[in-house]
Amino acid sequence: MVPMDRLLQIVRRFEFLEARLSAGAAPAEIAALSREYAELKPVVAEISAYRTALEDLAEAEAMLSDPEMRALAEDEIPALRARIPGMEQALRLALLPKDAADARPAILEIRPGTGGEEAALFAGDLLRMYQRYAEGQGWRFELLDLAPSELGGIREATARVEGEGAFARLKYESGVHRVQRVPETEAQGRIHTSAATVAVLPEAEEVDLEIPAADIRIDTMRSSGAGGQHVNTTDSAVRITHLPTGIIVTSSEKSQHRNREIAMQVLRARLYDLERQRLADARSADRKAQVGSGDRSERIRTYNFPQGRMTDHRINLTLYALPQIMAGDLSEVISALTAHDQAARLAEMEA
């Protein structure tokens, strides 16, 4: 049973927001009020449907005492009762605390791990996989920085993904992705294992955290392409070092001004993510065990090309649809991860 007083509080809050917006809230308030109103609207719709179902059931049960209506009530009651548990579960999910970062754009960072050039090639495959997934979702995918490897892979890539639910869906991708396949350069046909690391960060705005100028060092250098050759003759590439944490961010586009913007954007996202992780760890000692914890050292997934198999180790999900997955069809695995995370948070909330 979902506590009715909690539901009524939400309805009253929604009605208050509706009245404030209709009355013409102050310009400084409108954005925050509108955001909260939009978040509560689907929850209030669930509450309304649930209350209607309870009222219908109560009316049908009251009809049992009427000899003329008893038969009709006995026919209706089983179906009405059967609806209630599903509606209560939907309400519990709707009442889960929202991650404030879910509505933000995502900063996606991909780097090869163990495995040399094959790891760099796989990192490139992952970048294309996420780009296709983003395009399929109707999101905007912007490549912020790309350092290619000699054979067409990547040494490092940073992208920005913007669209409804971008970070909420992509945040489960943080971690170590392992690949098992026969490299194109392997003459003996032996299967090699290599890995790439993915980090997904919520984009941070300047108002989220202040970075004092004294805390950063900005260096300019020449941009390098595959094999380390210089791709231009001006010192346009930018490296920013955050002195308190030691975080280093680089950007090597052609415009030095744009490189500063990109590097600061990524640095803000990393620092914001550090603070989010610190707060999450303080709230729950079990956070590291949860799906979506963002632990970049965790091996989360294996892509086995000879078997056409992808296994997500966090939820023991195996799908034999690797070509489709690498082509950007991530909906099934991300939906499964979302459901698992919701179930874990529900259990924690109700414990």
UniProtKB/Swiss-Prot annotation:
* A GO CC annotation given for this chain: cytoplasm
| Molecular function GO terms recorded | translation release factor activity, codon specific
Q: Which UniProt keywords apply?
A: Cytoplasm, Methylation, Protein biosynthesis
Q: Give the sites modified to N5-methylglutamine.
A: Q229
PROSITE patterns, sorted: RF_PROK_I (PS00745)
The protein's predominant localisation is cytoplasm
Under InterPro entries, the record lists: PCRF, Pep_chain_release_fac_I, Pep_chain_release_fac_I_sf, Prokaryotic/Mito_RF, RF-1
Q: Which compartments is it annotated to reside in? A: Cytoplasm
Note whether Cytoplasm occurs among the keywords: yes
Q: Which Pfam families match?
A: PCRF, RF-1
Q: Which SMART domains does the UniProt record give?
A: PCRF (SM00937)
Task: Give the free-text PTM comment from the record.
Answer: Methylated by PrmC. Methylation increases the termination efficiency of RF1.
Q: Which HAMAP family match?
A: Rel_fac_1
Q: Which PANTHER family match?
A: LD18447P
The Swiss-Prot or TrEMBL record describes its family as follows: Belongs to the prokaryotic/mitochondrial release factor family.
Q: What does this protein do?
A: Peptide chain release factor 1 directs the termination of translation in response to the peptide chain termination codons UAG and UAA.
Q: What is this protein called?
A: Peptide chain release factor 1
The scientific name of the source species is Cereibacter sphaeroides (strain ATCC 17029 / ATH 2.4.9)
The lineage, from the top, is:
Bacteria, Pseudomonadati, Pseudomonadota, Alphaproteobacteria, Rhodobacterales
